[in-house]
Amino acid sequence: MHDNPLGTSLSRRALLAGSLGAGLAMTAVDRSFASPIPTVSDSTLSTAALTVLATTDIHGHVFDWDYFADAAFPPSDKGRSSAPLGVSRVATIAKQVRAEQGADSVVMLDNGDTIQGTPLTYLSAKQPDKLGHDEVMARAFNLVGYDAANIGNHEFNYGIAELFRYHNDLKAPLLCANVIDVKTGKPLTQGSLMLTKNVAG
């Protein structure tokens, strides 16, 4: 059992009872001074559809290709959580959904773990001059037209310089709210983003 830093004995039961009492007391506060919640009549409301497409754990798969077997992954490969995969397939789906919904009615996001996982991304990190200098996943994501991407833990596998090469080559904002630059004390990249979309109603 840990020592109580307050120097007093406080049981869990007493703490819960006190918290409950404080919570009930707060509900009795006079709210007459508060601004009324504005209401909107049904006649002024309109609806619109916003489609969010998100990818995660791409792990360097630009194509649905097994570089070690030099062949496409079989559709029912039991070693994978889903089949098929690859940014090339994502691009096909994104193009189709944008055509159906309207391009500005679609938000395209990636949740990270992107720049590591295949011989292609290894080559991009270790010998970029062999692939035209651009980070390969940034190039692929730029062609798909992502609106934003997040940093995953595997973005650090090849070092900070490679992470920032991806960041600099990526046209979409790269977001991360929980990694701080120790030199500046500031977030490594921007932590959030507001997107403006003109959604057809």
Q: Predicted segment positions?
A:
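Acidic, metal/ion-coordinating pockets
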Residues: H2-G201
